[in-house]
């Protein structure tokens, strides 16, 4: 998942979901440390590998495909807060309503992209680790990855639950975005 999951918390109105986001954030920290542990055991100088990740155009492009919608939501949320549009909401201001709806559209797209990340992209990247484990190679790393996959499956269930609740009308303003097709969520 995304380590910045906590940035969605101010836009969460359910204490149960906020607690869930806190646990999710903790899991992501553990995942990050687990990946670091694996890298330190595979490479004699893992710093070289870590440094090249941020310079590899293919990796950066793949990451931006997933995180683009998320970044747009976070940036818009900050702008919404700083512009004080939220203070106008109670007055029924036309502009504040448009801003709020646009923010919710971006939140929907961000959650849909995280859903795709958790449900598809991570499992594709785990395939090699699982194969090594089946061949009795790097079994410790394969076990770590299987625990991470278990957590990612929980994150998938969370995002699917959020999307399904929106689709069912949990938030009338958000339900209108649930007709978007998966490929449209990356805009």
Predicted regions and their residues:
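Short, small-residue-biased leader/transition segments that mark boundaries at the very start
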Residues: 1-6, 179-185
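Inter-helical turn/loop segments and adjacent helix faces that build the functional surface
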Residues: 8-19, 41-49, 101-104, 127-147, ...
